[in-house]
Each structure stands twice: as structure tokens, then as C-alpha cells.
């Protein structure tokens, strides 16, 4: 019956520019999947991550591929079931690619029920139609053997349906198909394909059901096998314009294979991506990115979207987190809101009634002022204390308004006052008699002050009538210049907000002769001084004469901005405002040149953000440091200009201001690192011409540092701890770039410069020192026609995948790779392990000699396949006996470096 079954190559019909021969693939039509007909379903999916694919030299797998819901103490395995059918049946499973349509994979399944073709089969029925596969392992095929393995699989599948053999033409077709499959196949991801066959009338299992495909299974040793996870963000909301800087902590990611995706889960399907470069990914565990703008600039209320991490190549995503876009704040400083307030009419300040008097009171005599209800509102700063409530005090106590009662033109004498007040004496006696002499004395003093104030106001009004100069009125009312409205704005604030230049000049003149009042530096409820508002509203002339009368430019608003910071954010008017500040001669101006805002940006950085070479010149000519570093990441003005791709600013900084092209950030990145990482050929060329160091290394090791020893011995406590960071080479601009044009520029520049001194080998393991003969032999092995790109797989295993595209077009990719590994401080054991895992035992024999065999580190521990813990090779050997030792030595000897 076995010979009656033909698994075929389901799904391997076409891929891009190649097609399989339909005469080779002849699958039978599956039974229709209907509500009444039989069909196959997956009951338990396989676990996607944490399972390691095994090479042949490693021996059989242990534990088996677990199920998706498997836990400690309750293990599950991939399970399928035939529904709507009872009777004998056969269920088989093989490996297919992770891309659609599924195609046969070069890897094979191994286990008790698996054949040489990598197909595992079990029988089910007639009652229980469920099949559980509890002993599946994945045999990893190396790239070197991949071509031969694929040809063998295709040949055997073809011969099962036609035993007479293949012609030469068919053999060539199979080889071409295998070659094309190799180009598109990912060796780190597989899927299980379950196929069910029912018994036919002749007794053979030849009636196929529709196959079902499992979810992808990732090799735990592959760089992209770890789950993506967002651990923390410092911001969950930002402006609809985008550009907000967010710090995101995450599980391990690869800087060249990660992006931050913003999206909406609705019918519109909007998505955008965070803006960051490879240098913004810190140690693979943190990303600093800038939010993208929302697709609608005008929103009335906050909008919540989602963000997630996404791998560029595999398409894997993390769990989504929420992010809120809030509406655009056009009037952050509230200037427009205050301008929209209704202007007062002439009669409003007088409390109603006739504009010559308030309330029901008549005209006051002498200098007593207006009577009636709200007349006291004219003197809020002078009436700090009064022993009487408004309108309740004795009318004869002081000359002035109150209560709406009409008053005499002169202060009455005591006798006439007593005689006149006699008819109403009973009603006033209870109020006056309890007053102590001290209170009466204070009331008299208060009345005297009011009388003097009225006299001064009257004199000012008379002077105004003669001169028509409003300053005469303001001088008499100068004590009222400190009055504030509900927003904390003084008359000077309001005059600046409304652009009343003549009023501002008049108030400033009075302020100049009344410095003791401190009006010029009073702040409103937003911590804005008049100078802040003059800068915000772009009134350069007002800025100048405010500074002349003592305005302090060093005072900060609620955002931590001084007048200079605000001037540099003023857009087109920034140069004139900045010039007015710098030429004022204020003592605080030199201090402002070296004062950061609350975001850690100095004026030179804000000038770059403003894209203004003129402002940069003004600042540097006044004493600002062009090499000043902002406090968040240590970037200079040249770093910021490079990030913004501002060719004009970069040219200006380098040629005129002589900015240091090799200045480093806190992470050791130069402007050339940023230009290369962002893929800017023009800026890269400019920086190289200006003398940028092509060999400059940042602080992130190209190869990861080895794990500290976990031994309990006392050896690791002897002597001082060594700093291994200096023993490893960091990333150069060439390591960071993904742009072909930038790579060409950097490679050409590297050929014209001297190589940097070799980095000493790491003290953590035997250093790699390749002789010319060994290097040539390895180049022949890895670059030969039979190698089929083995050097690229070696780069990935050595943690140097970022160099694959860089060295692909060189005459000897493997030679360049090995020299980089040697310069990076790579050790011999790591290279031996990588070659052994790839099945390149000849390379192992080339490197291993009598002098190096004894220097290899002791056998390391390897992870258990099912990801429930780990057991050492020695423990596995006790259970299974000694595994077959491959020629050339151990398959495991050193922890595999992780890929950046």
C-alpha cells in the first residue's frame, strides 16, 4: 500500500520567474471540503519559537517539537484530526517553506516514524481519527549540502510515481528547480504540512484530503528567532504633526532589521513608520525614534492609534501598544486667545451708569473722586486694607465715594456734622460706637492717602489737558502699572499682545522713571515676561527698548525657554530678534549663549533646528561654542545638521565655522556614522572630503562581548576585573550603512587611507591570528563554486551579518570577512564552532593544529530543543551514549556570538 501513495510536491508549482514541470508534480484532486464531507484540521499548533534545528553531526533530537500550549508539567505536541469521517486513514507530515504558496523545504523531519525523505506518517482510525506527533525533530541542512539535498528530494518523489528513472533533460530541470528554490528559501523558518489519505476501494491509502499548513517554526539559533516585545515607552502621546522623540525599551532586536510601525485598525488602513537610524538602536535593547505625522492635521479631539515593532525581513510583529495623537496647538502661548477677547467700551470701567459717575452716586466734590458702586475698582493695588466694607462706613469719615450717597463738596466741621447727622443718629450709633480709637486713627491715615492719590490723579489729568501727552496720565497712575487681570497680564503685557506700539513706548517711558516697581520683569500666569511676549509676537523694536529699561533676558518661561531660545524658534524673524538681543549689551546675554533649555539644547542647536546659517554666525561671533554638545545624546550642531540632511548647514559648519567632523556623541558616533547609517551619499562625500575618519569606531562592539564565566571557582575573583570593551572593535560607518552608493564611497575612501592599527585580541578566549596560507585555504573553501555562498552563512554565525552586503561585491568576500572578524577581536573557538555547525569540517581541519587543539575552551552548554531549560552535552551523553564524533572535532565548543 505504501507504493500507492504519491505525496507529490504540493504547492511547488511556480515561484516568481521559475516554474516546476507539471509532468513531475501530479497530485490527485483532494476530496471536497464540505460540511458533510471529511476534512483535516489542526487541533494543536506547533510551538513557534524556542525549538532548535539540529545538524546531522549533533545526533538525534531530544524532547520533540512541542505544541503551542505546552507548559512545564503539561506537555503537548502538534496534533491533527480528520473530521466527518470514521475508518482507517493515513496522516503524513513534512516540511514546507514559510512563504506562500508553500513549497518543499530542504530541511527534513526526523523521528521514530519518519522516512529518509523527511516524511513522518501515522495511521489513525477506525474510531479515533486524531494523530499526535510527539517525537518530531528538524534536521538542519547546511547551505553547502542544500543543493544536493533538494535534488535528492525531487528525484525520489519523482521516482516514486515513475520507477523507470529520469532522462537527462528531466535531471537538468530538477537541478534548475533546486537552484531556484535555494535562492528564495529561508533556512531558519519552516512550516509543517499535514496531509491525510483515506482508504480507496482497492485498499490503498490514495484518496487525499486538502492539506493543512501550520504556523511558522523558527530555529532558536537564528538571529530573528526571539519574540519582539515592547517593554516600556517614555511617551504615549504626541502632536499630530509628529516629530516627538520617544524612548522605547524592548527585547533584543537587530538594528538593520527592525522598524516601529504606527497604524489604525480600520477600513482606511493608515500606517506610517517611526523615524530613526541604526545609530538610534542602543545595544539591541532600546530604540530612540521620532513619531510620524498623523495623516490628518486637523482633528478636533485626541485620536488613539497603535504602534508595534516589526521585522523588515520576516514580517514578525510585537504586541501592539496604544499611542494618542492630540490636536495641533496653534496658540501654545495663548497670545491669539487673549487678542480675541472683547475690547472694553468707554463706560465699562466706571461700573455702569453715566461715564462721569458710578452707580446712583452723583458728581463728587473737590478731589473726592467718583461715587457709587464700582468706583473702588480703580485702585486695586492701593486698597490693600480698609477697616470698612464698601459702602458701609460712615460717610463723614473721609472724602471719597461710597454707597451711592451724595457727598458734600468739602469736609464738614464736627459741629455741623453732628447737627446734620442728628435725625439719623440712632441708625449709625451702633456702628460707630464700638470702634476703637486705633481703628479710627488708621481710617484717618487711609483717608489721607486716598486724598493724596486723588490730588495726584487730578494734577495728572490737568497736565494731560495742557500737553496732550498720555505719559502725564500714566505718571500719575504709575502705581497701577502692576495691576494684573485674570490671566496675570499687566497693562504692559496687554499692550504687547495687542501690538499697541505707542502705548508700549509710553508705558516703558514711565517704567524707566519708576524702576522700583519692577514692572518690566513681572510674569503672568504662564511665566511670561513682557520680553517673552515681545519675542513671541516678533516685535523687534519692542524687544530693544524693553532691554534698555532693564528687562532680564535670562528669565525662563514655563517651558524652560529664555528670550534667546524663543527668538531662535521664531521662524523667519529669528535673525533680527537674535541680533536685537545680542546687541543690547545686557549683562545676561553672554550667559544665554551657554544656557540649555529643558530639552538640553543650546542656542547653536536651536539655530540648526531653525535651519538658519545667519543665526549660527551671530551666535558663534558672539562667543557661542560650535562644538557644544546637547545634553541628551552628546550631539553637536554638525550631528544635528547631518541627521536633518541639511547639506547647506553641513557645508556652512564645516567650511566656515570649522566644525570638527570627527566629533563624537555619547555613544561614540561621528557625523559620518550618522550619514552612512541614514544612507545619505551626498553628505557622506562631503564629510569624507572634509577629513572624516573612515575607520572611526563607536562604542558598540561589532562582535558582542562574551558572557562572564559562571563557574563557582575562585579563579574569577583573582586580580582586578579587566575592561574588555577596549579589546573589541566598534562599528565603523561602513558597518552601519545599507546604501550601495554610500558603501562604494566608503570602500573607495578606505582604499586611499591607511588601515587602522589592529585591535588586540580579547583576553576572554584564544585570539584569532590567521597566517597567509591558512587565510588563502579558507578563501578557496568558502569562495569556491561548490561553497554556494557559505561565507554569508558564516558571517551570520559570527555575528557579522551587517557586513554581508558590504563584502558581497569584493573579489574575496570570505577573506574580507575573516579579516574583519580578526580585527573585531574574534576568537579561534568561535570560528571553529561556526565552521563545524555549517558542516565545513575541512575548514576546521585547516584551523586546528596540535598547538590549538589543547587551547579550545571546555564544552559549553547547549539549550534543550523544547525550550524548557537546558542540559549540558555531558548530561545528554550519559543518557544516549557517546554521539558519533564528526571528523575534525566537536560541533560545540564556544558560545555562539549574537548578531547585531
From Swiss-Prot:
Q: Does the record bear Transcription regulation in its keywords?
A: yes
Which spans does this entry mark as compositional bias, Basic and acidic residues?
849-866
Outcome recorded upon mutating residue 399 to A: No change in cleavage rate or products
Low complexity bias: where? 888-900
> Which InterPro entries does the protein's record reference?
Ankyrin_rpt, Ankyrin_rpt-contain_sf, DEATH-like_dom_sf, Death_dom, Ig-like_fold, Ig_E-set, IPT_dom, IPT_NFkappaB
What cellular component terms from Gene Ontology apply here?
A: Bcl3/NF-kappaB2 complex; chromatin; cytoplasm; cytosol; nucleoplasm; nucleus
The site annotation (Breakpoint for translocation to form NFKB2-IGHA1 oncogene) covers 490-491
Could you tell me which residues belong to the region GRR? 346-377
**Chain positions found as Phosphoserine:** 23, 161, 713, 715, 717, 812, 866, 870
GO molecular function terms attached to this record:
DNA-binding transcription activator activity, RNA polymerase II-specific; DNA-binding transcription factor activity; DNA-binding transcription factor activity, RNA polymerase II-specific; RNA polymerase II cis-regulatory region sequence-specific DNA binding; sequence-specific double-stranded DNA binding
Which controlled-vocabulary keywords does the entry list? Activator, ANK repeat, Biological rhythms, Chromosomal rearrangement, Cytoplasm, Disease variant, DNA-binding, Isopeptide bond, Nucleus, Phosphoprotein, Proto-oncogene, Repeat, Repressor, Transcription, Transcription regulation, Ubl conjugation
Could you describe the post-translational modifications of this protein? While translation occurs, the particular unfolded structure after the GRR repeat promotes the generation of p52 making it an acceptable substrate for the proteasome. This process is known as cotranslational processing. The processed form is active and the unprocessed form acts as an inhibitor (I kappa B-like), being able to form cytosolic complexes with NF-kappa B, trapping it in the cytoplasm. Complete folding of the region downstream of the GRR repeat precludes processing.
Q: Which domain of life is it from?
A: Eukaryota
Q: Where is this region: Disordered?
A: 404-435, 698-734, 849-900
Predominant place of localization: nucleus
Q: Where is this motif: Nuclear localization signal?
A: 337-341
Phosphothreonine: modified positions: 429
This chain's function reads:
NF-kappa-B is a pleiotropic transcription factor present in almost all cell types and is the endpoint of a series of signal transduction events that are initiated by a vast array of stimuli related to many biological processes such as inflammation, immunity, differentiation, cell growth, tumorigenesis and apoptosis. NF-kappa-B is a homo- or heterodimeric complex formed by the Rel-like domain-containing proteins RELA/p65, RELB, NFKB1/p105, NFKB1/p50, REL and NFKB2/p52.
Known partners and oligomeric status: Component of the NF-kappa-B RelB-p52 complex. Homodimer; component of the NF-kappa-B p52-p52 complex. Component of the NF-kappa-B p65-p52 complex. Component of the NF-kappa-B p52-c-Rel complex. NFKB2/p52 interacts with NFKBIE. Component of a complex consisting of the NF-kappa-B p50-p50 homodimer and BCL3. Directly interacts with MEN1.
What is the designated name of this protein? Nuclear factor NF-kappa-B p100 subunit
Q: Which organism is it from?
A: Homo sapiens
What is the organism lineage in this UniProt record?
Answer: Eukaryota, Metazoa, Chordata, Craniata, Vertebrata
Gene this chain is encoded by: NFKB2
Amino acid at each position: 500500500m505504501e507504493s500507492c501513495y504519491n505525496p507529490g510536491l504540493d504547492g511547488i508549482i511556480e515561484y516568481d520567474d521559475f516554474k516546476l514541470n507539471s509532468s513531475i508534480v501530479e497530485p490527485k484532486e483532494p476530496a471536497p471540503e464540505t460540511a458533510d464531507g471529511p476534512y483535516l484540521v489542526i487541533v494543536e499548533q506547533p510551538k513557534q519559537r524556542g525549538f532548535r534545528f539540529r545538524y546531522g553531526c549533533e545526533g538525534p533530537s531530544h524532547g520533540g517539537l512541542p505544541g503551542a500550549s505546552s507548559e512545564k508539567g503539561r506537555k503537548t505536541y502538534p496534533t491533527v484530526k480528520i473530521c466527518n469521517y470514521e475508518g482507517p486513514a493515513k496522516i503524513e507530515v513534512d516540511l514546507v517553506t514559510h512563504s506562500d504558496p508553500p513549497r518543499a523545504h530542504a530541511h527534513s523531519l526526523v523521528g521514530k516514524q519518519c522516512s529518509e525523505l523527511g516524511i513522518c506518517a501515522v495511521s489513525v482510525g477506525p474510531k479515533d481519527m486524531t494523530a499526535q506527533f510527539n517525537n518530531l525533530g528538524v534536521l538542519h541542512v547546511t547551505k553547502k549540502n542544500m543543493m544536493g539535498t533538494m535534488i535528492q528530494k525531487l528525484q525520489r518523489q519523482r521516482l516514486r510515481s515513475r520507477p523507470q528513472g529520469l532522462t537527462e533533460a528531466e535531471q537538468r530541470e530538477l537541478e534548475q528547480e533546486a537552484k531556484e528554490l535555494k535562492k528564495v528559501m529561508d533556512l531558519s523558518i519552516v512550516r509543517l504540512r499535514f496531509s491525510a489519505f483515506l482508504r480507496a476501494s482497492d485498499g490503498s491509502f490514495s484518496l487525499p484530503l486538502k492539506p493543512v499548513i501550520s504556523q511558522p517554526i523558527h530555529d532558536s539559533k537564528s538571529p530573528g528567532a526571539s519574540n519582539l516585545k515592547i517593554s516600556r515607552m517614555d511617551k504615549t502621546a504626541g502632536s499630530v504633526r509628529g516629530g516627538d522623540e520617544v524612548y522605547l525599551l524592548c527585547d533584543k532586536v537587530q538594528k538593520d532589521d527592525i522598524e516601529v510601525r504606527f497604524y489604525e485598525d480600520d477600513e482606511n488602513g493608515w500606517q506610517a513608520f517611526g523615524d530613526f537610524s541604526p545609530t538610534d538602536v542602543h545595544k539591541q535593547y532600546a530604540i530612540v525614534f521620532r513619531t510620524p505625522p498623523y495623516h490628518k492635521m486637523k482633528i478636533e479631539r485626541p485620536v488613539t492609534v497603535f504602534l508595534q515593532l516589526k521585522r523588515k525581513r520576516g514580517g514578525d510583529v510585537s504586541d501592539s501598544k496604544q499611542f494618542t495623537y492630540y490636536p495641533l496647538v496653534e496658540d501654545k502661548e495663548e497670545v491669539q486667545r487673549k487678542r480675541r477677547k472683547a475690547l472694553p467700551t468707554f463706560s465699562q470701567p466706571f461700573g455702569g451708569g453715566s461715564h462721569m459717575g458710578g452707580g446712583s452716586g452723583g458728581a463728587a466734590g473737590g478731589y473726592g473722586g467718583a461715587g457709587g458702586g464700582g468706583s473702588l475698582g480703580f485702585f486695586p493695588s492701593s486698597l490693600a486694607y480698609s477697616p470698612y466694607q464698601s459702602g458701609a462706613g460712615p460717610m463723614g469719615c473721609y472724602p471719597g465715594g461710597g454707597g451711592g450717597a451724595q457727598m458734600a463738596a468739602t469736609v464738614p466741621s464736627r459741629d455741623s456734622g453732628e447737627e446734620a447727622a442728628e435725625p439719623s443718629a440712632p441708625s449709625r450709633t451702633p456702628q460707630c460706637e464700638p470702634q476703637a480709637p486705633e481703628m479710627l486713627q488708621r481710617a484717618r491715615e487711609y483717608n489721607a492717602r486716598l486724598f493724596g492719590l486723588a490730588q495726584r490723579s487730578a494734577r495728572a489729568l490737568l497736565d494731560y489737558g495742557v500737553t496732550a501727552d498720555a505719559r502725564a496720565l500714566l505718571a500719575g497712575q504709575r502705581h497701577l502699572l502692576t495691576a494684573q487681570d485674570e490671566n496675570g497680564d499687566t497693562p504692559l503685557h496687554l499692550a504687547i499682545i495687542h501690538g499697541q506700539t505707542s502705548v508700549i513706548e509710553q508705558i516703558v517711558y514711565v517704567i524707566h522713571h519708576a524702576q522700583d516697581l519692577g514692572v518690566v520683569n513681572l510674569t503672568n500666569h504662564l511665566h511670561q515676561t513682557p520680553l517673552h511676549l515681545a519675542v513671541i509676537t516678533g516685535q523687534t523694536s519692542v524687544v530693544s527698548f524693553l532691554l534698555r529699561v532693564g528687562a532680564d533676558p535670562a528669565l525662563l518661561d514655563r517651558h524652560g525657554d529664555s528670550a534667546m531660545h524663543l527668538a531662535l524658534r521664531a521662524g523667519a524673524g529669528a535673525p533680527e530678534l537674535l541680533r536685537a538681543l545680542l546687541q543690547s549689551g545686557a549683562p545676561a546675554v553672554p550667559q544665554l549663549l551657554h544656557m540649555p533649555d529643558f530639552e538640553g539644547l543650546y542656542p547653536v542647536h536651536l539655530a540648526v533646528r531653525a535651519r538658519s546659517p545667519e543665526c549660527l554666525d551671530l551666535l558663534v561671533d558672539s562667543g557661542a561654542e560650535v562644538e557644544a554638545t546637547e545634553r541628551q545624546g552628546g550631539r553637536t550642531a554638525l550631528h544635528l545638521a547631518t541627521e536633518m540632511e541639511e547639506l547647506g548647514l553641513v557645508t556652512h559648519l564645516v567650511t566656515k565655522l570649522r566644525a570638527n567632523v570627527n566629533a563624537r556623541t555619547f555613544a561614540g558616533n561621528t557625523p559620518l556614522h550618522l550619514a552612512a547609517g541614514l544612507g545619505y551619499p551626498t553628505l557622506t562625500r562631503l564629510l569624507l572630503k572634509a577629513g572624516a575618519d573612515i575607520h572611526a569606531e563607536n562604542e558598540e562592539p561589532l562582535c558582542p562581548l562574551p558572557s562572564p564565566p559562571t563557574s563557582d571557582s575562585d579563579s574569577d575573583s583573582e586580580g582586578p576585573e579587566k575592561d574588555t570593551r577596549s579589546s573589541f572593535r566598534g562599528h565603523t560607518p561602513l558597518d552601519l550603512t545599507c546604501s550601495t552608493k554610500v558603501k562604494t564611497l566608503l570602500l573607495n575612501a578606505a582604499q586611499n587611507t591607511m588601515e587602522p592599527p589592529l585591535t588586540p585580541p580579547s583576553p576572554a578566549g584564544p585570539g584569532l591570528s590567521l597566517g597567509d596560507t591558512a587565510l588563502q585555504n579558507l578563501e578557496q573553501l568558502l569562495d569556491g563554486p561548490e561553497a554556494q555562498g557559505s561565507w554569508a552563512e558564516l558571517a551570520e554565525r559570527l555575528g557579522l551579518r551587517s557586513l554581508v552586503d558590504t563584502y558581497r561585491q569584493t573579489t574575496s568576500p570570505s577573506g574580507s570577512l575573516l579579516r574583519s572578524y580578526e580585527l573585531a577581536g574574534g576568537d579561534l573557538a568561535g570560528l571553529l564552532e561556526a565552521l563545524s555547525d555549517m558542516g565545513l569540517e575541512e575548514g576546521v581541519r585547516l584551523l586546528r593544529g596540535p598547538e590549538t587543539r589543547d587551547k579550545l575552551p571546555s564544552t559549553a552548554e547547549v539549550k534543550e530543543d523544547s525550550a524548557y531549560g537546558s542540559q549540558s552535552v555531558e548530561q545528554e551523553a550519559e543518557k544516549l551514549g557517546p554521539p558519533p564524533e564528526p571528523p575534525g572535532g566537536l560541533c560545540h565548543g564556544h558560545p555562539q556570538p549574537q548578531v547585531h
